[in-house]
């Protein structure tokens, strides 16, 4: 190459450099622009190396040496820029794809959770829930503070449904839920908010958040759920049904089994109602104002399992063994039902877990089995296998740990006094929002139980290299086999179980652990011993 040709070559390289620069400005517009920029950068680099590979006429010229080094630096920089922008664009596309997949997954889970048959009714019911703050309540409770957390959830009565079964009434009583104020009578209220003043962050004292239910119209329909194969329960159920019909003029709905038993006993009970198929059972929440359970905690679990969506308030009478969720004494059922039917009364909102099984053969995470709602816990154990359970656990896509032991318990706070407690988990107040993560006989001295916030999603997966299978059970029933590659997804359901309180949520909880578990029961120390 002659010196006369050198300016033309340099001019061509500048043109190539300008072309690369113009392509760099268009990289963010899409993957095609990214590819074009990358190709242009590679061609520019190749041309620069071809030019530098030729023997210059005056190799000792300092300007040519400096120009050669500058061109090499430019070529490397252009290559790094093109590669960096291409990688950034690819990463952005991957995050966008993950976001769209997650949103589609959540929508699919919501649709499956509601059930295709009851979807229209649930949407109608959700549209009737309005959040209000009455002016009278705000002025009477909060004074002049200006901010009030005394919002109430008002449930308007749904209109009659022409598709409903003729065996069930079509109108439901309306009610309101409101926060309690610790029984304060002085007009002062402790707000639940975080303030920022003068550079300091402070949390105001919270009220005890007791939830009160007040009927706006009289309850018309009561559903009875009873413990089977118990003569004392059967006798009490017949007595309560007769009393509600004769003294309260209330419609009574019972299970098909109970209906058959009562009608066999006496034709007087011809007025009771029941359901014939699963379609009618799915619509119970739109007809029933109140649920009365006669039995123990297992009866409450069974009653909750009948409702895959909203659950009416539950009044649980103790006719079982321990009774953590059954505070009402059966001997005083008249007074108890009078107080509940007249209102207002305290309730405990007990969260439920929504569980999905994703099989390894599924094409994507949208292909899940029918969701299962649990009130106490979901247990994953090794079943009859002689090998340790091997589970990989994730929390919102973050790796938590690998479980090697007899299994794992994922529990609600209501279930903290059940299997989780026996496995070493802590007892937690049922209105504390959280998910308990409790191992079963872990093969590790440092594996302690966890309590996670209620908004997380847990994923428990049996890895492909696991030596054995695992079994999942939901509130002690509906066991499902989890083969290597299968996963279980757990999150808090939007539909809690509201249980009526005898006194209030905290008093009932403390009474249950004292009377049911004899918590911290020991002989008191003698006062006449040695002293300091």
Curated annotation (Swiss-Prot):
Residues 1-26 have a biased composition (Basic and acidic residues). One of its GO terms (molecular function) is NAD+ kinase activity. It catalyses: NAD(+) + ATP = ADP + NADP(+) + H(+). The keyword Metal-binding does not apply. Residues 1-32 are annotated as: Disordered. GO terms for biological process: NAD metabolic process; NADP biosynthetic process. InterPro entries: ATP-NAD_kinase_N, ATP-NAD_kinase_PpnK-typ_C, NAD/diacylglycerol_kinase_sf, NADK. Its EC number is 2.7.1.23. It comes from the Eukaryota. Keywords: ATP-binding, Kinase, NAD, NADP, Nucleotide-binding, Transferase. Belongs to the NAD kinase family. This is Probable NAD kinase 1. It comes from Oryza sativa subsp. japonica (Rice).
């Amino acid at each position: 190459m002659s010196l006369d040709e050198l300016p033309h070559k340099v001019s061509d390289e500048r043109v190539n450099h300008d072309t690369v620069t113009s392509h760099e400005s268009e990289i963010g517009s899409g993957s095609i622009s990214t590819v074009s920029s990358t190709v242009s950068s590679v061609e520019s680099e190749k041309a620069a190396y071809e030019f530098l590979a030729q023997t210059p006429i005056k190799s000792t010229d300092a300007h040519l040496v400096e120009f050669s080094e500058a061109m090499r630096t430019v070529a490397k920089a252009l290559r790094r820029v093109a590669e960096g922008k291409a990688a950034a664009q690819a990463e952005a596309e991957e995050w966008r794809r993950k976001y769209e997949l997650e949103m589609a997954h959540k929508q699919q889970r919501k649709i499956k959770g509601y059930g295709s048959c009851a979807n229209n009714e649930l949407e109608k019911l959700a549209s009737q829930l309005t959040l209000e703050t009455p002016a009278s309540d705000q002025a009477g409770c909060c004074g002049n503070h200006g901010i009030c957390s005394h919002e109430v959830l008002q449930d308007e009565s749904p209109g009659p449904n022409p598709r409903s079964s003729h065996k069930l009434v079509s109108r439901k009583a309306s009610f309101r839920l409101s926060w309690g104020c610790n029984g304060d009578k002085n007009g002062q209220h402790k707000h639940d908010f975080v303030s920022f003043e003068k550079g300091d962050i402070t949390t105001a004292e919270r009220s005890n958040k007791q939830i009160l239910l007040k009927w706006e119209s009289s309850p018309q329909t009561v559903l009875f759920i009873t413990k089977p194969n118990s003569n004392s329960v059967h006798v009490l159920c017949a007595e309560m049904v007769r009393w509600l019909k004769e003294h309260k003029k209330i419609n009574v709905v019972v299970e098909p089994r109970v209906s058959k038993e009562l009608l066999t006993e006496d034709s007087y009970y011809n007025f009771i109602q029941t359901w014939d198929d699963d379609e009618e059972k799915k619509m119970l929440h739109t007809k029933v104002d109140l649920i009365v359970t006669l039995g123990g905690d297992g009866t409450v679990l069974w009653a909750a399992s009948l409702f895959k969506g909203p659950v009416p308030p539950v009044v649980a009478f103790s006719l079982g063994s321990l009774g953590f969720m059954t505070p009402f004494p059966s001997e005083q059922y008249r007074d108890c039902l009078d107080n509940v039917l007249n209102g207002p009364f305290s309730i405990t909102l007990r969260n439920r877990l929504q569980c999905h099984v994703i099989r390894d053969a599924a094409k994507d995470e949208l292909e899940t089995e029918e969701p299962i709602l649990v009130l106490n816990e979901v247990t994953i154990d090794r079943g009859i296998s002689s090998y340790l359970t091997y589970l990989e656990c994730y929390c919102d896509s973050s790796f938590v740990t690998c479980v090697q032991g007899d299994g794992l318990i994922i529990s609600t706070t209501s279930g903290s006094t059940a299997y989780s407690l026996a496995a070493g988990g802590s007892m937690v107040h049922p209105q504390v929002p959280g998910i308990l993560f409790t191992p079963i006989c872990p093969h590790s001295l440092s594996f302690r139980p966890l309590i996670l916030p209620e908004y997380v999603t847990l994923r428990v997966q049996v890895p492909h290299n696991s030596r054995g299978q695992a079994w999942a059970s939901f509130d002690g029933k509906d066991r499902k086999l989890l083969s290597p590659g299968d996963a279980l997804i757990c999150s808090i359901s939007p539909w809690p179980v509201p249980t009526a309180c005898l006194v209030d949520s905290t008093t009932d909880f403390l009474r249950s652990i004292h009377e049911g578990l004899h918590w911290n029961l020991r002989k008191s120390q003698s006062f006449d011993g040695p002293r300091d």
